[in-house]
Amino acid sequence: PSLADYLGPRMLPWLDRIFHKPVEYLGCTRQYAKSNWKLYYENVKDPYHASLLHLFHTTFNIYRSNMRGRSVMDDGLGVHSIITTTPQEDDDTAGDYQKHDIATYRAGLKLADPSMLEVRREFEEQTSNNIHTLFPSTVIQQIHNTMAVRQVLPKSAGEFELVFHFFGYQDDDVALRRLRLKFVEQRRAHLHRQPVAGVADTVVAGGLG
């Protein structure tokens, strides 16, 4: 079938939302994991995992479980899905996390470079998280202004490689391109085990069972 037929009418608009104009490749990261590839692929479809594992997302209001969100499956094969979250300007969700002593929220945590949290409006609906899983092994992300295609490459029943392909748009201005590249460097720092804002790595967590 064609890509449009394979994805179906519910999924195709989300793909078109990201790839609505020419893109420019910004680089990639590669990570080898000792777990089954399906654990990672299913994990990214779980909207609760980020607030339970990732201190950076929770503390700095990129993703919290009590944000407004949606989860949509394709209406054909039932194997593709999209999850999104949209922070509300008047939401004070930090109080809920403090009240219940959630480990991934740390009120005193500050960034050396707060400009990483800047957001440029690029879409009609400015979601903070847009995670689009395309069966069998592709994930398309938009987290704030960071966009990437993730490849999940099985190597054996108990090992896989995860590749993040980062991109921007060809007409990015200098400031927007710099903002995108900051998150590419954050990802690389994380993989080299330099100090970054995170509690647990999704890939590593998959191999703990």
Please report, for each region that a protein language model flagged, where it lies by residue.
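C-terminal catalytic domain of Rieske-type non-heme iron oxygenases
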Residues: 1-209
